[in-house]
Amino acid sequence: MQFASDEIRTERLLLRRARLNDAEAMHKIMSDPVAMRYWSTPPHSELAETEQWIASMAESDPATRDDFIVTFGGRLIGKLGAWRLPEFGFLLDRVYWGQGYASEAMAAFIERRRSLGSSELTADVDPRNQASLRILGRHGFVETGRASGTWQVGDELCDSVYFRLAL
């Protein structure tokens, strides 16, 4: 595994900083109601929404945000990283679910944060998202609490399970 400030390479993946031209590929994921089921916002209905989201990701301050586009074979398959350190999250195109890509990207990101001297990573997960709960558990995250009604996503009020990984 190799990482520089702007990218992380694993056996199968390249995690790199967002580019404005990533919006269309990311919109395919962010407009998918199944992929976005447990995300903190409703699916994006317009490409302009995703363009704004990608622009924010691309222009972010690396001192407070360590966010990456995940690619496999040159194809954008999702994102993983911290939009507000130490909290991080991940989102993959559902075509790539169940193949170990999220776990591989997460392991590399954890190692990166460890090498940079971070003391912890945290995550806020919808308790219905069993796949994410399992991945976090496999990587050593420990549940630190639960709360009801923490996210308003469209018409739905969602709950949270909080996790922490000491680095």
Please tell me what each predicted stretch does.
Residues 93, 124-128:
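Residue-level recognition of the GNAT/N-acetyltransferase active site
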Residues 136, 141, 163:
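Conserved active-site tyrosine of GNAT-family acetyltransferases
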Residues 124, 142-159:
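Conserved catalytic-core motifs of GNAT/GCN5-like acyltransferases
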Residues 87, 128-130, 148:
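Residue-level marker for beta-strand->alpha-helix junctions and adjacent short loops that shape enzyme
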Residues 97-115, 130-138:
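Conserved acetyl-CoA-binding loop-helix of GNAT-fold acetyltransferases
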Residues 1-95, 108-112, 116, 120, ...:
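GNAT-family acyltransferases
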